[in-house]
Amino acid sequence: MGIYEELVARGLIAQVTNEEEIRSMINDGKATFYIGFDCTADSLTAGHFMALTLMKRLQMAGNKPIALIGGGTTMIGDPSGRTDMRKMLTKEDIEHNAACFKKQMDRFIEFGPGKAQMLNNADWLLNLNYIELLREVGACFSVNNMLRAECYKQRMEKGLSFLEFNYMIMQSYDFYYLFQHYGCNMEFGGDDQWSNMLGGTELIRRKLGKDAHAMTITLLTDSQGKKMGKTAGNAVWLDPNKTSPFDFFQYWRNVDDADVMKFIRMLTFLPLEQIDEMGRWKDARINEAKEILAYELTKMVHGEEEAEKARTAARALFAGGSDDSNMPTTELKAEQLTAGKIAVLDLLTACGLIATKSEGRRLVQQGGIVINDEKITGIERTYTTEDLKAGLKIRKGKKVFHKATM
């Protein structure tokens, strides 16, 4: 089975410009492809998994990845899938975020001469002459066609700034530049990027008279159609300082039964034959499949040692054991207490378990907070310095665990 056929079997491909040519190129290891990452945060998220694992699979098959950091396009902001305008970042913020991305990508793909490259489109976009760009590139784009693009439709009623309207042209120029200077013949991206990607292939055809190709990756969604990568409205980060390895493990361990086999097929590197066999598992073995999913992904992001720790801690908690050594922990300071005490809502806030006091009240009223096996029934509950020194094991809902110490 060639790599293209494997991508199809794993359900990773959404749309392609020319299936036969793309199949031939990537199966023969002749593709130099790029995927763009707008560095709007200082960490990648679980939502980037599809792109990262695709780059790894294709590199293993002999193809050359280019991870393109959007140092220039991030200054504009991609309107795709947005109903509002993205926050604009400083050049320093973007450079810092790019460095963080590189560190995380190192776990997935191998960088170096003749291997993967990381480039920053600020290196060519920030030096463009506006008049020259309009004459050489702008003339190749139809405004009528651009306005029909899916990436702009959601913004038309609320208002689409001219700044954002240029995003498609900038992304297309990236592909054109990479084709000329790096031999990049293929662009991969999320399914919501299709219009932008077609703009790049068309620009190359019109300016250079050559063929380039585009392929979109299936968006990672659950059985309800919701994008994966967030929990309770918060991103699931790949940075262990933002989402601990334990919380990362638990996120995947707690996916719906209906989703687990799809995610194993799409995201892990387990052989397809093994996955087909797992697909016949039922009842209690579904939980075993969830643990395998969580372990494989945590190992990929945080390493085998952290994955083992997270699995051990999760098993202990599930079995009602006392091993909380690998549980996410917050160490409180004396100044966070008042007269040697802290109220339960302040405790939950300090541990990052609630965003607002009203959320905390609602959780308490619904019986969703358990501390040291005691279900909290009132917000007047307080804890002392001695309680914290002994350690407080907090459970939020059924699946979120945290420890508070002092």
Per-region residue spans from a language model:
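NTP-dependent nucleotidyl-transfer catalytic core
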Residues: M1-Q193, L198-T201, K207-H213, K226, ...
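Conserved nucleotide- and phosphate/pyrophosphate-binding catalytic cores
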Residues: I204-M406
